[in-house]
Amino acid sequence: MEDAGQNPLDDEAEITEIPTLEAIKQNLKYLNSDLEKDLQRLDEANQILLRKIQKKEESIQSLERDIALSIGRVPERDDFNEILAQKETALKDLELESAKLEKKNKTLSKNVMELQKKISKGLKNIASDPETLKKKVTEFKVKLQKSTESCAQQEKEIAKMESDYQSVFQLCEDQAHYIKKYQEILREMEKEKEVMLLEKEISKAQNDSSQVVKPGSTLVETIQSNMEKNIIKKQKRKFWLRHFRYLFFMVMIVIRLLGYVFFHLQYVNPDFLVDTLPMLMSRSSLKWLRDILFPFLTLEVEDVLPH
């Protein structure tokens, strides 16, 4: 009788546990769907962030190229160098931060994928024990809280990085604007210099024409003649400079060859001339050369010797 009284109670407990288990399964399914949605959102946010980072890196690289080109044309100054060094360090720091954030995104995506796999395995291997289900639900909740916290931190870091990129981009734009203005000022100064030089040449030509006036000559002819004279002078100067360079290099080569010959005759083969001259010259020419060089090669030691 007691067994018969206990069996219906167990059946009633099992009947009450079945809907709870079904509710837990449904909750797990909802949690899995929410996790998948969060993962999709994270992937979309990561892709958007990567696109923004690539666009900003491309714009920063283009600005760096423009700045490098403008600096190659503009004379170097300490202020520009300091500003560019600061911006380069800031860009390097931002690139390091972006690399760190990309690594964090990769680790987060891996963790989320592992969570998905674990959830799918847990749904397949759901046990009938409510205690294990409750433990798994609590574990999933803890993991969800951790993932949401990490996502919030990542969003904060992304917002901070975007603000830093915007500030650096604005600074680069300002720098490029100032460099363009500086180039325009330099061009205007060069134009003014050219105008001044032309005015000086015209004044010289006018003075020359006022001092010596040729019959039928005009101011334009005098200016043309002066310009032709200047061009001829420049061409002559270039011609003489070119020939002077060639002459200088030839003299240097001859001096070096003479040095090599002297070294060879002094240290390597001192008897070279004695051996080769009889083969090249006749006896009469050798005698004549000996008579000429004999006074220079003999040593006068009579005054030095003791009496």
UniProtKB/Swiss-Prot annotation:
The keyword Transcription regulation does not apply. The chain crosses the membrane at residues 246-268. Its main location: membrane. Keywords: Coiled coil, Membrane, Transmembrane, Transmembrane helix. It is a single-pass membrane protein. Residues 20-212 form a coiled coil. It is found in: Membrane. PANTHER family: TRANSMEMBRANE AND COILED-COIL DOMAIN-CONTAINING PROTEIN 5B, TRANSMEMBRANE AND COILED-COIL DOMAIN-CONTAINING PROTEIN 5B-RELATED. Belongs to the TMCO5 family. This is Transmembrane and coiled-coil domain-containing protein 5B. It comes from Mus musculus (Mouse).
